[in-house]
Amino acid sequence: MMTVRIATYEDVEQLHNLHFKLNRHRHQLQPKNFQGKSVDEGWIKDNIKSTHRDYFVLEVGGEIRGMALIEMLENYSIPGSVKYRYLNILDFMIESELDLDTYGHQLLKAIRRWGKDRYLSYIQLNELANDVKKIDFFAKEQLAVTQQTFKCVI
């Protein structure tokens, strides 16, 4: 059985382990930009208690096998731009043994509902350019590239 729910403090250790797997994956894709280690558990707890952030956890067979860290933001207003409140996905991770299309879809469905309940305008996220599997997944879920980030060593 699969369920998606908001994380609690009891989930901190499992979220810590998922962040480790996610950051190890990112490190394999872009070793110059990511360390292959987890995040501080205090940071996870701060996100759980935040009023503008939430963790979603994906449980399969009673075990947490995926997570998403999301936040509610407002875009900056510069002359000529339209101001929006939107949902930003900071981290999105489904364990590699699971089918991303099936389980990721359910996790994203819960995220969309969270955004609609808060009357947010759109979903935004940054994904590594060479994480083809996730890019393909988000494209299937109707997320479109609207900007690109360019980076070079100074």
Model-derived segments and spans:
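Conserved GNAT acetyl-CoA-binding A-motif
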Residues: G115-E127
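Conserved beta-strand in the GNAT
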Residues: V57, E63-M72
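Conserved acetyl-CoA-binding loop-helix of GNAT-fold acetyltransferases
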Residues: D91, L100-R113, K140
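A short beta-loop-alpha structural element at the N-terminal edge
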Residues: T3-N17
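Conserved active-site alpha-helix within GNAT-family acetyltransferase domains
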Residues: A129-Q147
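Conserved GNAT-fold acetyl-CoA-binding loop/helix
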Residues: R24-I44
